[in-house]
A protein has these predicted regions:
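Glycine-rich phosphate-binding loops that contact phosphosugars or nucleotide phosphates
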Residues: 47-180
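Glycine-rich phosphate/diphosphate-binding loops that line cofactor/substrate pockets in enzymes
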Residues: 37-49
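A ubiquitous structural signal for well-ordered alpha-helices
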Residues: 23-26, 30, 42-45, 67, ...
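HTH-adjacent hinge/linker in prokaryotic transcriptional regulators
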Residues: 1-38
Length: 180
């Protein structure tokens, strides 16, 4: 079999990934009072905080950096935590008036949960943007904004679309900017 024939056969035999279906479903779910209330609660947490810290691991870490910068552009003091092993040493005097925004598809990553628990020990607030309300992260957070995307894996790597996360981050930043 020639390489071109093999590639053509492979192309037709593999199911095509269409991100539009889950994204359309997500956007439909955002057009309701429950989602608007979650956004209002999250916006209030951001506006009440003296500082906002974003945290995620892997792709979620890259989006945490983006979210931090985007929120800073809206006039909020915001930083991202890039190292999941950062010894937080959270004391109430340091984090009591701050917010940790945690991005995680699974909501179950051990290192991420350890950071959240340390942060909460210092009386900081936690906003989780995660794929499900049934994760450990969701149970720990003060406010959870779920996005319910079908999980896509490549071995141990997570390829779940992050379009809803970007949508939520940008929407929150715009709401915060308008509220100031």
């Amino acid at each position: 079999m020639l390489k071109q024939e093999w590639l053509a056969q492979k192309k037709t035999s593999m199911p095509e990934y269409d991100v539009m279906l889950p994204i359309t479903e997500f956007l439909d779910k955002t057009n309701n009072e429950t989602f608007r209330q979650l956004l209002s609660q999250a916006t209030a947490l951001i506006l009440e905080a003296q500082a906002v810290f974003f945290f995620g691991i892997g792709t979620s870490g890259a989006l945490a950096q983006y979210g931090s910068r985007y929120l800073a552009n809206a006039g909020i003091f915001s930083l991202s935590i890039n190292d999941p092993f950062t010894p937080v040493g959270m004391r109430e005097t340091v984090v009591a008036d701050t917010l940790l925004v945690v991005l995680s598809v699974s909501g179950e990553t051990t290192e991420m949960l350890a950071q959240v628990e340390q942060y909460q020990a210092g009386k900081g607030k936690v906003l989780a943007i995660t794929n499900s309300t049934h994760s450990t992260l969701a149970r720990l957070a003060d406010v959870v904004i779920p996005y319910y995307m079908p999980e896509e894996k490549n071995g141990s790597l997570n390829n779940t679309t992050q379009i809803p996360v970007v949508y939520i981050l940008e929407l929150l930043a715009h709401r915060v900017a308008c509220a100031q």
